[in-house]
Amino acid sequence: MTRRRDFGALRRLPSGRWQARFRLPTGERVTAPRTFPTKADAARWLSAAEVDRARGLWIDPRAGAVRLEEYAWAWLDSRVRLAPRTREIYESQLANHILPLVDNGLPPLGEVRLGDITSELVRAWYAALERSRSVSTAAKAYTRLRQILGQAVADDRLAKNPCRIDGGGTERHPEQRFANLQELYALAGAVPKRYRALVLTAGLAGLRQGELFALRRRDVDLLRATITVRRKRLRLASGEVIEDDPKSAAGRRVVALPRQLVAELDRHLSEYVLLGSDSYMFTSSTDSPLERSNFRMRVWYPATEAAGLEGLRFHDLRHTAGTLAARTGATTKELMARLGHASPRAAMVYQHAAEDRDRLIADRLDLMAEESGLAAVVPLSGRTRKASGDTHQR
């Protein structure tokens, strides 16, 4: 039985459930993507569709009928400017954390239609991912899902993004570890001599490992005491080795070197680097470009154990360089430029790590006051106190 209305129509099906539908100006009929247990429920859907159409917010329910798995892979294929390593990371997030089953009480998200992904489902998926994987993994996967569904909104497949977890994409990293100067030089002394300059360059200049592995002789200018970062070198999970631009445009930079590092690099160039401007700065004992995994197992792990710094990552030397730079009084912008950060957020970490400079700042303020001839206030502990029986005069 069909019920006539000013907008659309309601129909009771033989099953007893209710169906809502209406016609577009083109004459095409649109049916609600689901049936409703009561006439009132169906009427509410129809009324909402009428209001959304009047406001220009209506989304054809059929547009959201595509499964997330199909839409997500198509979205990734459309990202033609992604760096190869970034594409690998996105593929892994989709295949391992976003699309498959993460909890027996939930459907695999990849099998759910876009229009059926609700905020409640996203929250349950996120919580299950935190439990079964880790907080950091859940945050990364959530950020990617939000990005994909944001594109679905832009494509008029969804009216709004169901990813609305406050702080859901915020990663909570453990306290960053770094080596002090004594530990840095202990590490440099623990590695074979051909890697000494590599360790010190990481810990004093703050280059990323891929940037260090890509350095050539022509990138090091001892006269000007600088290193020019032009590229990074890494091996993909597929086994392919790529050399391309640094992580971001800010990664292309010129880094000033302290004198002690210039001396180390001068010695390294004469002893370990082949002639020719395009020769790699840091190589294996066979003069081959360094491989991350081989270096970690054969050089780094034994050195950290010998120096009593087990658990320290090579990337932590970059934290060391950032922290040491912050302790010199470098501003956020200066740290960004030196370390190749595109945003202030990462650079601020090193300023927080250098909070012990706050006492030095206070001491220097005292010195400024003294140099200006301003008398310091005598602290209460330095004053002569009256005996407890003395009468206090008002």
Regions from the PLM with identified roles:
Residues 18-23, 42, 227-229, 257:
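Short beta-strand motif preference
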Residues 48-57, 69-134, 148-151, 308:
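Basic/aromatic-enriched alpha-helical hairpins
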